[in-house]
Regions:
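Active-site pocket-lining/capping segments in soluble small-molecule metabolic enzymes
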Residues: 1-258
Length: 258
């Protein structure tokens, strides 16, 4: 997958050319696309005409539907039940969906998918808590600008960690072309679902983007991929290895459910 930004310069050709030159990459559209940035994302879709996309934005999903492009409902659409799957399939010809990470094993088992519909699940990713158009760095690490402008959106790349009065830490992260976001200090890591529900799910997904880590040491992505591949092959040792590599992680949402 190739994750597209939330904000674009006037020229979107570099993204269009990248996707055209690498047709194996599946465009991944973000949830927040406002005004001209939404129009830019539509332009990329029209220029590239990919076979398949992942969209966390229903506007892009509708555009893909009208163009006859296969689309998958992204994890930020937070799909939790059979009715949502059926609605997306019948109204927008959705080809599949990431199931919500907030539902537990029993709730997932009760979901009935439409015919010819894929079910996907993210087993490793940063836990996003909030995205805002407000700058979070002015009152933390400091910034001279009074508010976010177009230049900030395109060039600013910062991350830091804050701790509240209860001693709980949160990670603030700003990517180039993205809005400032706050993440849980723990990564979501659910290896249990691989043995629980592998027969019900078509694809497992891991998010290796460097977000939500604050000032922590970056993980070896090649080693992470290797261990996850071994996990999916049914080996037991990778569970121990992954917990050793990803020190701060949780799957409490999967255990508790809605």
């Amino acid at each position: 997958y190739f994750k597209l930004p939330e904000s674009y310069k006037k020229d979107t050709s570099k993204y269009s050319n990248l996707l055209k030159n690498n047709p194996r990459l599946i465009p991944w559209f973000p949830a927040v696309l406002i005004g001209k940035d939404y129009n830019a994302a539509v332009k990329i879709l029209e220029e590239v005409k990919p076979q398949r996309i992942v969209s966390n934005n229903t506007g892009i999903a509708y555009k893909a539907y009208t163009m006859g492009i296969e689309w998958i409902a992204g994890p930020f659409l937070n799909t939790t039940n059979s009715y949502a799957l059926r609605t997306m399939k019948e109204t927008l010809n959705c080809a599949g969906a990431f199931l919500s990470n907030e539902i537990n094993q029993m709730q997932i088992r009760k979901i009935h998918r439409p015919e010819n519909f894929k079910l996907l699940y993210s087993i490793y990713h940063p836990i996003l808590m909030m995205t805002s158009r407000q700058c979070f760095f002015q009152q933390t690490v400091g910034c001279n600008k009074p508010s976010i402008d177009d230049r900030c959106m395109q060039t600013c790349k910062k991350s830091t960690t804050i701790t509240n009065i209860k001693g709980v830490s949160f990670n603030i992260d700003k990517q180039r072309g993205g809005y400032p976001s706050i993440y849980n200090h723990e990564q979501f890591l659910n290896m249990q679902i691989v043995s629980d529900l592998a027969n019900l799910l078509d694809e497992f997904f891991i998010d290796l983007t460097d977000i939500g880590t604050g000032s922590k040491e970056k993980l070896d992505k090649a080693q992470l991929i290797k261990q996850f591949e071994r996990l999916l092959q049914g080996e037991l040792e990778p569970e121990f290895q992954l917990h050793e590599m990803i020190v701060e992680s949780t799957n409490q949402q999967y255990i508790q459910g809605l």
